[in-house]
Amino acid sequence: MFHLVDFQVTIAEILLIIMRTFKVSIWNLDYIINLIIKNLSKSLTENKYSQLDEEQPMEID
């Protein structure tokens, strides 16, 4: 019979083997993910357009 716990353990073992072969630790992975998120958030929050406050409102006749 198929057991979910056995499946989860085998997935975890496979991930550990992959991480050992590529010499990636959980701490390094966390650091890399944080760097990616920080760079993405910086690029998204950069203001490339003029502020609405600086623009002149249109006059309606």
UniProtKB/Swiss-Prot annotation:
Q: What GO biological process terms are annotated to this protein in UniProt?
A: symbiont-mediated suppression of host cytoplasmic pattern recognition receptor signaling pathway via inhibition of IRF3 activity; symbiont-mediated suppression of host ISG15-protein conjugation; symbiont-mediated suppression of host JAK-STAT cascade via inhibition of STAT1 activity; symbiont-mediated suppression of host JAK-STAT cascade via inhibition of STAT2 activity; symbiont-mediated suppression of host type I interferon-mediated signaling pathway
Q: A Gene Ontology CC term for this entry?
A: nuclear pore
Which segments carry the region annotation Important for host Golgi localization? 18-24
Single Gene Ontology MF annotation: protein sequestering activity
What InterPro entries would the database entry show? NS6_bCoV
UniProt keyword Membrane, yes or no: yes
Signal peptide feature range: none
- Membrane disposition: Peripheral membrane protein
The record's note on quaternary structure and interaction partners says: Interacts (via C-terminus) with host RAE1 in the NUP98-RAE1 complex; this interaction disrupts the host nuclear import. Interacts with host KPNA2; this interaction may inhibit IFN-beta production by blocking IRF3 nuclear translocation.
Q: What does this protein do?
A: Disrupts bidirectional nucleocytoplasmic transport by interacting with the host RAE1-NUP98 complex. Disrupts cell nuclear import complex formation by tethering karyopherin alpha 2 and karyopherin beta 1 to the membrane. Retention of import factors at the ER/Golgi membrane leads to a loss of transport into the nucleus. Prevents STAT1 nuclear translocation in response to interferon signaling, thus blocking the expression of interferon stimulated genes (ISGs) that display multiple antiviral activities. Suppresses IFN-beta production possibly by blocking IRF3 nuclear translocation.
Instruction: State the name under which the record lists this protein.
Output: ORF6 protein
Q: Which organism is it from?
A: Severe acute respiratory syndrome coronavirus 2
